Amino acid sequence: QVEGAVLKGQKNPQKLPVLKNIQSCFVYNSARKVSTFESSNRIFNAAHRLIEKAVRSNMQSVFTDCPHREKLGWLEQVHLNGPGLLYNYDLTAYAPQIMQNMADAQHSNGAMPTTAPEYVIFEGPGMDAFAESPEWGGSLVIFPFMYYETYGDDSLIKKYYPNMRRYVDYLKTRADKGILSFGLGDWYDYGDFRAGFSRNTPVPLVATAHYYMTVMYLVQAAKMVGNDFDIHYYTSLAQDIMVAFNKCFLHKDTAQYGTGSQCSNALPLFLQMTQDADEQGNYRPDADLNEKVFANLIKDVEAHGNRLTTGDVGNRYLIQTLARNGEHELIYKMFNHEEAPGYGLSLIHISEPKRLLSISYA
């Protein structure tokens, strides 16, 4: 939008400046590119370029997830896209700023908003889920470990350990017998319905799994800072959450979690929560249960024609769980096509220079 001027050749009764030419510049963060990707697959190469363009568009002073519309620093992108960001860019200057933004946005009671900086306060009927969600706020605890695993630099963990602990303590106040029941869940999951709030997977399952994840990371952080009391306290808390999770969501007769959706089963598999009580009532990893839940996950993907049904949150855990278990051919089938859901769909409808990553696969 241009105001206070007219294009060359247009009427100009007010004698405004005349624009002879306008040049648009692609501006993004100065984080240095550190890797390249090239394969023999046309779809994968184009998808990588598509994603790269989307990432650069969102890498401003704040890492946003929507550069043309909301322009807010939605926090789930930080850890869900964290591995891809760290593989592709040098974030040694950018990541500390992201962490400081989160620390500054943290509320006095330890709560984390869904965006940082928190320029917008989500209030009113139906807006609670947008105000705070464990899958979003959890970036405060999860992302420093991604940074550490990439660079071997534990400074973010040590500096923000008090913030991380305050957030976990806050989540504990929101839990009912170990279960969290608020937030956006597997936002924008895929199916024969209008995308938005999670439909395939229960919100409490996704929220509680992320609660468990943040506590487990905090235990690691406590070991790194040498806080013995916190090590024991949060290890016990993690165990309580894991037990509550399995009691609430595991269907032993079918070896399914929650609704049996891809996200429902992928999350506990990814987090190694597939545990069961022994004769003494102690929960331990159950290899047989893990195998059966994983088999059900594969069956569901195949039942959907080798297509995913996960959303913004579940995508990462689905792909990582399949990859960890050697299902590379299945992952290939899931993305080597030009149908929805998949990146290939947008590649056949729009020419390369104008091609952008859409908000959904539909």
Where would I find each of the regions flagged by the language model?
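The feature captures the catalytic groove of carbohydrate-active enzymes
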Residues: Q60-V62, C66, N109-L140, K172-L308, ...
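Surface-exposed acidic, glycine/proline-enriched linker/cap segments
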Residues: H48, E52, A195-N200, S351, ...
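Acidic glycine/proline-rich low-complexity segments
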Residues: R32-T36, S40, M334-L347, S351
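Single conserved hydrophobic/aromatic residue that forms the stacking wall/gate
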Residues: I348-A362
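Substrate-binding groove/exosite segments of carbohydrate-active enzymes
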Residues: Q1, G9-T173, F182, G314
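Catalytic-core region of carbohydrate-active enzymes that cleave or remodel glycosidic bonds
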Residues: G314-G344
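Structural helix-adjacent loops and short alpha-helical linkers that scaffold large soluble proteins
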Residues: G9-P17, L86-M99, Q106-N109, Y148-R165, ...
